[in-house]
Amino acid sequence: MYKTKISVYPSCLSTLVHNDVTLSEVYDKIKNDDVLRQRTVNYRKAIEAKLPAKQLKKLKAEQFPMLMPAARFKEGRDMEHLDSYTGLCQCDIDNIPPDMMAEAKRRVRMLKFVAMFHVSMSGNGLHIYYFYQIPNEGLTPQVYQ
């Protein structure tokens, strides 16, 4: 589980250049990277300042890394460049009321299948990563034929 590598792109705009990193490395960056922390603070301030959704989307796309938890790619981010599946999935829960966040985190911690979770960039949600078994592994290419 901790050796599984996922593709992480510098931003949502990047389609070719990426790093393959473990969940432990992702978690460490989220918790300890000063640049990422400052960008998150700035993003949350932009939300509080009620910047238009279009500007927030642009800021998010340009300033934050993009994780691809479900699959690894050799080059581009499309089926043509699919290298392998990770067996990992991300659940994104948005709009958690502030008075319920601690309870939501407590409950997620209790789930045995959860590999990692963190608070979302907005501060109002959770990104939850979990492993699943791939049914009929290897049949996916047939779907696209």
Q: What annotation goes with each model-predicted range?
A:
Residues 86-90, 125-127:
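Short, solvent-exposed beta-strand edge segments and adjacent coil->beta transition regions
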